[in-house]
């Protein structure tokens, strides 16, 4: 049975842990509010840009005037999956969920592609796939620190350059889509080539006018569309990470409080037993002196 001192030390240790988890929960809650605002502001623009460009591209394809390599279909032998994870842990199943989701995607598409490589955004994804000896083509570090659109633009530009150079025939983007503070959805979207199949029917009945030209418009907007999809994925992942960490720290804080209550009860019982034993010894000594 542990001594009173051991129990007191354990209570003090758990209280210190509770203070840390409570502080981390508050920090994550503040970051979540900012990240959630950024996601809600970005989503409408990203969705509208996606719809508009998909319709433009679908119309061009319908008229057999595809003039941009990001739209041109080709045989898909090699693929790349860009996986967005976090640099830090203590976020519940945030990182493990998306990593396992990507592993299932790789298994399900093993027959579709001759070779699938990975690019990781975040230390946790790199560590996960490196431990499983999977090919990591590119590791992006420092993206989550001071998250900015320029970083998403650079990442999208590098992926586009690899695609245009013929190093890969398809690029996919995997990330946690933010639903709520306690809910995230793992998704994999095709980044390149840009998929216009969903907008084909809607675009045929629309009369588009292009200034200065269709080719110039697509050349300007398609790379921006790819960058915006990457930017949205980074924002969605950041909000999901903060929400997952806030929930994990809230759960850890509650567990610490329950443990403190249990240890306090154990301490009081041990102290009561110790006092009772002392009284019995005093009474026994007094009886012996009679």
Swiss-Prot record:
Family: Belongs to the ATPase gamma chain family.
Source organism, top-level taxon: Bacteria
Keyword Transport among UniProt keywords: yes
UniProt name for this protein: ATP synthase gamma chain
Molecular function (Gene Ontology), one example: proton-transporting ATP synthase activity, rotational mechanism
PROSITE patterns on file: ATPASE_GAMMA
Pfam families listed in its UniProt record: ATP-synt
UniProt KW keywords: ATP synthesis, Cell inner membrane, Cell membrane, CF(1), Hydrogen ion transport, Ion transport, Membrane, Transport
Localization terms from the record: Cell inner membrane
GO BP terms: proton motive force-driven plasma membrane ATP synthesis
Family annotation (InterPro entries): ATP_synth_F1_ATPase_gsu, ATP_synth_F1_gsu, ATP_synth_F1_gsu_CS
One GO term describing the cellular component: proton-transporting ATP synthase complex
Role this protein plays: Produces ATP from ADP in the presence of a proton gradient across the membrane. The gamma chain is believed to be important in regulating ATPase activity and the flow of protons through the CF(0) complex.
Species assigned in the record: Anaeromyxobacter sp. (strain K)
Keyword Zinc belongs to the record: no
Assembly with partners or alone: F-type ATPases have 2 components, CF(1) - the catalytic core - and CF(0) - the membrane proton channel. CF(1) has five subunits: alpha(3), beta(3), gamma(1), delta(1), epsilon(1). CF(0) has three main subunits: a, b and c.
PANTHER family: ATP SYNTHASE GAMMA CHAIN, ATP SYNTHASE SUBUNIT GAMMA, MITOCHONDRIAL
Topology class, membrane: Peripheral membrane protein
């Amino acid at each position: 049975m542990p001594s009173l001192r051991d129990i007191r030390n354990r209570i003090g240790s758990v209280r210190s842990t509770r203070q840390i988890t409570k502080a981390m929960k508050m920090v994550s809650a503040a970051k979540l509010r900012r990240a959630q605002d950024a996601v809600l502001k970005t989503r409408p623009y990203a969705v509208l840009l996606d719809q508009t460009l998909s319709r433009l591209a679908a119309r061009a394809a319908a008229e057999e005037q595809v003039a941009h390599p990001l739209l041109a279909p080709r045989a898909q032998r090699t693929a790349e999956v860009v996986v967005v994870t976090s640099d830090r842990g203590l976020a519940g199943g945030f990182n493990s969920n998306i990593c396992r989701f990507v592993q299932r995607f790789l298994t399900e598409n093993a027959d579709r592609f001759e070779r699938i490589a990975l690019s990781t955004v975040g230390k946790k994804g790199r560590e996960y796939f490196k431990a499983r000896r999977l090919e990591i083509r590119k590791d992006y570090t420092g993206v989550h620190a001071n998250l900015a659109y320029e970083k998403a633009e650079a990442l999208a530009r590098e992926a586009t350059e690899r695609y245009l150079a013929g190093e890969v025939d398809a690029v996919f983007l995997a990330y946690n889509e933010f639903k709520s503070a306690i809910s995230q959805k793992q998704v994999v979207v095709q980044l390149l080539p840009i998929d216009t199949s969903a907008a084909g029917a809607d675009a045929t009945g629309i009369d588009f006018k292009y200034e200065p030209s269709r080719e110039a418009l697509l050349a300007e907007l398609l790379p921006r569309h790819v960058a915006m999809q990457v930017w949205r994925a980074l924002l969605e992942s950041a909000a999901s990470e903060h929400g997952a960490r806030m929930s994990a720290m809230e759960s850890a804080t509650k567990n610490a409080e329950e443990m403190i209550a249990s240890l306090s009860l154990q301490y009081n019982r041990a102290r009561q037993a110790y006092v009772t034993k002392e009284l019995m010894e005093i009474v026994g000594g007094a009886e012996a002196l009679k």
